[in-house]
Amino acid sequence: MENNNEKFNVSVVLPIKSSNVIGFDDYFKKCIDSIKNQRVGINELVIVHTDETNLVEFLDSYDFESINVKRYVWTEEPSFALQVNHGVEKCESDWVSIFEIDDEYSNIWFKNVKKYVESYPEVNGFLPLVIDVDERGVFAGFTNEATFALNISSEMGYLNNETLHTYQNFQISGMVLRKEIFLDYGKIKPSFKLTFGYEFFLRLTYNSVKIMTIPKIGYKHTNMRTGGIFWNYKNGEDVLTENEVKFWIESAKKEYFFTSERDIKYQSQEV
C-alpha cells in the first residue's frame, strides 16, 4: 500500500447495485486498489449497497486494509442517483467524489486536487481528465478535455453553462466537489434517465459554481460495461429509444433552473 500518511479531506462515495455482474471481483479489486495506492490518502470510503446476499457477504469478507470504510445498506429500489445522494449526506468530509466499481483513480488524483484546492480556493469543483476504455481495457477516448478546446470553452480550463449547451460529454464520476455545494444545489435528480449528470452540471454552472478541469489524467472509466447503467439504456432492460434520448437531453436543458426534483417523466415528442 502507498505510504499516504498525508490526507485530503474527501469522502469517496461508491454506490453498488449488485455483485452478480461479469467480472465484478476483478473490477472491485482494481477500484479499491486505486484508492489504496493514492499518493495522498482519502478521509473515508462511503459504500451504499443493496442488501443482495452475495454482495453483502463479499463486502463483509473484503480486506480494505487501512481505508476508513463506512457502509450503508440501501433497501429501496436500486438507484445510482439516490444511493449517491444518500452517501453524500452521510459523508463527514468537506469534499466528496463519486466513484464507480468499474473505474479507477490515478494514484496522483487526490494529491493534485489537494494542490489545486490550496491554489484556487474560489473553485468549488475539480474534474479529472478521464481515459475511457472498453471492457477489454482498450482505449476508447477522453472525457472532460473539452474545457481546453478554444472553439468550445470561452474560459480555458473551466466548465461553464455556455460550454455545456455546446458540448455534453462531461462526467460526474471522479469529480471532486464541495459537499455543501452538492447538497445546497439539489443533489442528483433521480427522475432523470441518461442525462442526470448533464443536468447536474447545467444546474451547478447556472448557479455560478466554479468548476475546473485539472489538466492531468486522473481517472479511468470503463465505457459501456455489460450490465452498467448506460449499457442498460442502450442494450439492457431499460433501453431508450432515439426519441427518449432526445427528450432527456432537452429536459436537462429545461430543468436545471429548478434546484428541487420535479419528478420528470418521459413524454413522447412525436406529433
Question: Which residues are covered by each model-predicted region?
Answer:
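Short, acidic, metal-binding catalytic loop of nucleotide-sugar glycosyltransferases
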Residues: 30-42
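Acidic donor-binding loop at a coil-to-helix junction in glycosyltransferase catalytic cores
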Residues: 193-200
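Nucleotide-sugar-dependent glycosyltransferase catalytic core
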Residues: 78, 138-144, 191-193, 206-247
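Short, flexible, basic/aromatic active-site loop/helix in glycosyltransferases
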Residues: 145-167
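Short beta-strand/loop segment that forms part of the nucleotide-sugar
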Residues: 43-52, 72-75
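Conserved donor NDP-sugar-binding/catalytic core segment of glycosyltransferases
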Residues: 108-144
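Glycine-rich, basic loop-to-helix element that forms the pyrophosphate-binding segment
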Residues: 74-91
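Short aromatic/hydrophobic "clamp" motif used to bind/position activated sugar donors
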Residues: 96
